[in-house]
Amino acid sequence: MNDKYSTTEGKTSEKLSDEAMLSAQWKNIDWHKAEREVNRLQIRIVKATQQKDYNAVKRLQYLLTHSFYAKALAVKRVVTNDGRRTPGVDGVLWNTPAKKMAAALSLTDKRYRARPLRRVYIEKKDKKKKRPLGIPTMYDRAMQALYALALEPVAETTADGKSFGFRKGRCAQDACEYLFNALSRKHISPKWVLEGDIKGCFDHISHDWLLANIPMDKNILKQFLKAGFIYQRELFPTEEGTPQGGIISPILANMTLDGIEKKLVERFHTNALGKVDSRFKNAHKVNFVRYADDFVVTAATPELALEAKELIREFLAERGLELSDEKTVVTNIDDGFDFLGWNFRKYNEKLIIKPSQKAVKAIVSNISDTILRRGKAWQQDVLIMKLNEQIRGWTNYHQSVCASDAFAHLDYVLYELLWRWAKRRHPKKNKCWISTKYWHRVGNRNWVFSTENKELIRVDSTAIVRHTKIKATANPFLDVAYFQKRKFDKGMHRLTGKFKTIWKNQNGLCYHCGMPMDVTEEREIFYLAPKAKTGTEDVRNMRYVHCACQRIYAENRLKK
């Protein structure tokens, strides 16, 4: 009995020792060096792709996917994103430094078998329908993140120039600017627009096409594609489409749709010698802009727009995809069309881009839900914090278009909803009492919904700032300084007051990792000395950090 106890005690001690060692190794990873080493290989993959040396691409991808630093970065991505607390079918979470290090050491392509996805259903934006979502295991997510590091340099190099969705350094505002350039000139710009809608793009891409055309390890890709999913304890196979909820899925979808622009250029912009001819380009006025699976084609006549539609239909059919005839329509620019949450329409030959009615209704619905349902019992400062998050996100997205009227309307809606919220809380109090309790004078502004510490953002105070479109040929792996400057400039445009000062002082770099930050992505303020001790928000004590970096920093301090 004593011998058995001693053996168990020894194994426990050994396990604790191993965990301590793995934990220390994870905490001591040099993330700067990891980024540099992986980026060095990615640059070589880009150059090999440009030279069409696909044997070199394959060799370099192998080196990258077998690199410890790439594996560590893949695990880091999985354990710091929003789904880090959501397990797959195996119920496993990597929630300690030791588990993360063990995971990084265990990633391998040898005998790799992807586990089925866990199927859940989440509400769509209209809340009337639900859409399926597949949740891979942590291990499968990390494998996808690892192979995405090797595939993305190829995807960025071969991508259509006017493709802007799910790509590094590109955004919906870039797509908007390119459409503005194509449609804004008086009496010269194209009059007709083909609004494209692909039926269930991510769900129906042909596996045969992907396996034949995507330049990556075919066995690994097949595992990603054929994993299947489990719903209500029953296993279902996947015969088409990209992995739902998968990290690599947007890259696969983009690579599937890349080539539409080239096909349109060959048909409408080139002469009999196969060279781009400005005469054809100016006569046909065919332009193409795509964001993920949403696209727009401009044309001089409705007949040319319909011809473009047929070319795209043929292109998609080879990939197992088809257009929705009901939603793929040809529209005159004077009647207007919606794209990416904006309405594009000409009024007396002047192009106006503004938030679409659907986008305005959506934000009003979300704010109403926050105030009257979720926030009915919240304290005022909590409600202000939640509303400010929603308002900032919406105004940041729309501040590069003609949004002043929409912003003013949103201010009016906010006031009406907040007054209803206050009346519900104090049904026996009069208007004067309610207004005195919740609305105050702040600086030169009257009637500000505020507390001692927080105040509600005034929506129409958001400055309208024209977005600077990206160079269509820019590559994020080669033009590093260009992309870093764009990120910094975006922060300088979006931020105000002390937050702009902090951003400027740090040159837009994360205080923890030293890597560039994107002002539109997750970031937070880190206090050098705890705010509880200083009691003030002095910019000298404040630094911007990535949320993911702050989580790692806090975790490492906690485990010490």
Residue ranges and their predicted role:
Residues A24-G83, L149-G165:
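Charged boundary/loop elements
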Residues M1-N2, T370-K429:
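Right-hand nucleic-acid polymerase module
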Residues K226, Q232-L235, R319-L383, E389-R392:
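A conserved non-catalytic segment of reverse transcriptases
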Residues D411-L495:
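Extended C-terminal regions of large enzymes
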Residues G514-C547, R551-Y553, R557-L558:
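Histidine-centered nuclease catalytic patch
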Residues K498-Q506, G535-V539:
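Short, flexible, mixed-charge glycine/proline-rich loop motifs
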